[in-house]
């Protein structure tokens, strides 16, 4: 695998940080902080956090109106923990993000923020998030910390640049939001909470591998061993289909949610599986990957919103 020129990378990063530290011409804005926090990721994960919270209240028989502050602390805490993890990820990846089209304009790359500023911003966000989760239950705070540790240390600092298993490791951290939401109400974690965790866990590989296929040359240039880079598209497609099958099975294990949920979950799963299998015949792999990526976003939103709606 071709590795990026680390000497040039280091020089670019040092120069950018020096410029950011020595001048006040470039004024920081809230938009820059939101970019570092990856608000798209945070927002989508807050949907699953709320679903966990709502379902926990439903199944232990309490009214959400009696847990107003718990809802606030949970959503704010989860958002800050996720934002902190994403900001720290920006700090860690600032030496390679300039090699990728979708990340080259991040404040961590352009020099608008110094590396030290990004690092401290991530630490403060993460600590504040854990604190707010602690105001709900210790279990929620511990789960939040575990998710943060897995994402920042095990994924960003270790496996992302060393193994194709990076996607699996990242999927663990990405699957904890429903657990955070549920444990903020009920620390015992019902089996439904764990099924929601596994839905998130199996959803992420086909989602992120589709993105990796779309951006395969960028990942190759950055030296990141994503599966499409190391094993090629055919192997990646097979892996994606396997995960979609597992996801569909797990989602249907929540059949006690009712016939409407079960029917829609089955349709969503079979539809995604059909699209996945079609990829073996499509000539345009990038177009197929784009379709898989968009489908994954719709799948997640519809499924978790539906979990809430059928319990209203």
UniProtKB/Swiss-Prot annotation:
GO process annotations (BP): heme O biosynthetic process
Q: Where are the transmembrane segments?
A: 40-60, 68-88, 113-135, 139-158, 165-185, 193-213, 240-260, 262-282, 291-311
Q: Name one GO molecular function term.
A: protoheme IX farnesyltransferase activity
For this UniProt entry, what is the primary localization, expressed as one broad class?
membrane
* Membrane in keyword set: yes
Membrane topology term reads:
Multi-pass membrane protein
Alphabetical GO CC annotations of the entry are: plasma membrane
Q: In which pathway does it act?
A: Porphyrin-containing compound metabolism; heme O biosynthesis; heme O from protoheme: step 1/1
Q: What class of enzyme is it?
A: transferase
Pfam families the UniProt entry points to: UbiA
Q: Which InterPro entries match?
A: Protohaem_IX_farnesylTrfase, UbiA_prenyltransferase, UbiA_prenylTrfase_CS, UbiA_sf
Enzyme Commission numbers on file:
2.5.1.141
Q: Which reaction does it catalyse?
A: heme b + (2E,6E)-farnesyl diphosphate + H2O = Fe(II)-heme o + diphosphate
Q: Name the CDD domains for this protein.
A: PT_UbiA_Cox10
Q: Is the keyword DNA-binding assigned to this protein?
A: no
Keyword annotations for this protein, in alphabetical order, are:
Cell membrane, Heme biosynthesis, Membrane, Transferase, Transmembrane, Transmembrane helix
Annotated compartments: Cell membrane
The similarity annotation says:
Belongs to the UbiA prenyltransferase family. Protoheme IX farnesyltransferase subfamily.
Q: What is annotated about its quaternary structure and interactions?
A: Interacts with CtaA.
Q: Please describe what this protein does.
A: Converts heme B (protoheme IX) to heme O by substitution of the vinyl group on carbon 2 of heme B porphyrin ring with a hydroxyethyl farnesyl side group.
**Miscellaneous comment in the UniProt entry for this protein:** Carbon 2 of the heme B porphyrin ring is defined according to the Fischer nomenclature.
What protein name applies here? Protoheme IX farnesyltransferase
Which species is this UniProt entry from?
Halalkalibacterium halodurans (strain ATCC BAA-125 / DSM 18197 / FERM 7344 / JCM 9153 / C-125) (Bacillus halodurans)
- UniProt lists the gene as ctaB
């Amino acid at each position: 695998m071709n590795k990026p020129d680390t000497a040039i990378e280091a020089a670019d990063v040092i120069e950018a940080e020096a410029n950011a530290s020595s001048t006040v011409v470039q004024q920081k804005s809230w938009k820059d902080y939101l970019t570092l926090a990856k608000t798209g990721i945070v927002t989508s994960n807050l949907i699953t956090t709320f679903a966990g919270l709502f379902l926990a209240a439903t199944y232990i028989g309490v009214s959400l109106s009696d847990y107003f502050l718990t809802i606030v602390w949970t959503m704010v805490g989860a958002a800050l923990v996720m934002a902190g993890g994403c900001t720290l990820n920006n700090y860690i990846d600032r030496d390679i993000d300039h090699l990728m089209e979708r990340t080259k304009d991040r404040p961590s790359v352009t020099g608008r923020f110094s590396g030290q500023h990004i690092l401290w911003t991530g630490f403060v966000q993460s600590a504040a998030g854990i604190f707010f989760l602690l105001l709900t239950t210790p279990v929620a705070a511990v789960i939040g910390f575990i998710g943060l540790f897995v994402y920042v240390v095990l994924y960003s600092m270790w496996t992302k640049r060393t193994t194709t298993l990076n996607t699996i490791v990242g999927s663990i951290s990405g699957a904890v939001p429903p657990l955070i939401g549920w444990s903020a109400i009920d620390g015992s974690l019902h089996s439904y909470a764990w099924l929601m965790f596994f839905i998130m866990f199996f959803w992420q590989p086909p989602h992120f591998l589709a993105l990796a296929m779309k951006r395969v040359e960028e990942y190759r240039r950055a030296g990141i061993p994503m599966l499409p880079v190391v094993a090629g598209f055919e192997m990646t497609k097979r892996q994606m289909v396997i995960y979609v099958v597992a996801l569909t099975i797990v989602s249907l294990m929540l059949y006690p949610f009712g016939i409407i949920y079960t029917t829609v979950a089955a349709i969503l799963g079979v539809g995604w599986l059909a699209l996945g299998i079609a990829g073996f015949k499509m000539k345009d792999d990038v177009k197929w990957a784009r379709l898989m990526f968009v489908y994954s976003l719709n799948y997640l939103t519809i499924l978790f919103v539906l979990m809430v709606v059928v319990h209203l």
